[in-house]
Amino acid sequence: MMWQLARQVLGSAGKACLAFWLFFMGSGFGFVYFLSSAEAFAGIFTGFYTTPTNYTAENIVWVNPIVDLLIPQRATLFGWCVLFPALYLVWRFCMEEETRLWRYLALLVLPLPLMHTHSALALVLICLACGVYTLVCRPRTKAVLAPWGWFALVCGVVWLVEMWNTVFAQSLDGQHMLRLHLNWINGQDDGTLKDNYFWFYIKNIGLVYLLLIPAFFHAKPKQRWLYGGGLAILVLAEFVVFQPNNYDNNKLLYIWHLLGCLLVASLLMDWFSKVRAIPWRALGLCLCCFIAMFGSVLTVGREALSDYWQWSADDIAMADYIDDNAETDAVFLTSDSHLCPVFSLAGRRILCGSGSFVYYHGMNYTAECNAMHQLYENPDEVFLAQWGIDYVLFDSYVFSNIQNADESWYAARYPLWYENGGSRIYKING
């Protein structure tokens, strides 16, 4: 649907193809940091989180949307599956004056806040820009304005009900779900920036960012109005954070970037269409695509070529044993590693998961985290019973993250239920 959106907005299949690739395979200049040596370049394919689109040591954080958003984050995948066709309908509803489409648009987006709140907010801001366009550029008649009113009323009422006890409650509960913060992940808590504001986006987004201004003035008036919704997203996301993790504002910024890719694709295709010699035209486009996409090509290539293992054979064997022999409702005391085989492979409940899961979406499990440390460092039978622990795991993750873990206390009191390599599990109950 992203391609269909681009084709509808730009009026050209060729421009739509370029916009599609600029968005899904576009990247900045992060690849330059890996050209210093063969070893550094090889690290793209062998290192952990060392790619031209995700290299935090140099403040490169504009990740590839396929590898780092759509595949690992189901909410983003589901949200974009609704948002992109919704934007397609918004364009036809507003800019092509097909007012009858408001019903289908409303029906499509009614569940969006429950699927992906950031996509819902992005849609609101783009609709606001399109609504302003309608007021300014079209007759203010009932036939023109009534569909907007019905669309806003239906979505407003349903979305309010959906978000009342979730999004709104979390935003106002004092857990820092909604607060002011400057310049996304480049901004620091003291108000300073890690990099110069413009240099941060130049090296992260690259060619598309450099061409945004000429692309905006080259665009047609309706395309500029649509991009105005993207600018509203950018301004809001640069000053307001909507969740405890500042980084997650990128789910808004990528929609601004999507609209920018449309304009830049149109600009590049129109520029090179003026080059009469086809070989030079092709060479120019290929050079632009290389500059704009090389980082993402390396990032995606890394996924196919990297050969490190997430779990060892011992981890898999332990997970199989747990799956076959542990009660389905058993609770395990483990480290909070997001790769813990008990949870990620065997699917059993654990006391405390990684903070990278839902903690940054407003679920506060500080008590569970503190209990995890106490049960490893200062274990107590009463405290074990209080948290309903059935099994306790000791492995390399436990000893590396909890330095004072007291395995001897468990070994003296409970039977060794499982042992494999460096992993041992003690059974607490029964």
Question: Each predicted region: which residue ranges?
Answer:
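Perimembrane helix-loop-helix junctions
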Residues: 90-97, 105, 122-153
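Membrane-interface alpha helices of multi-pass inner-membrane proteins
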Residues: 67-70, 89, 102-117
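Hydrophobic alpha-helical membrane-interfacial segments at the cytosolic entry of transmembrane helices
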Residues: 19-22, 139-165, 208, 212-214, ...
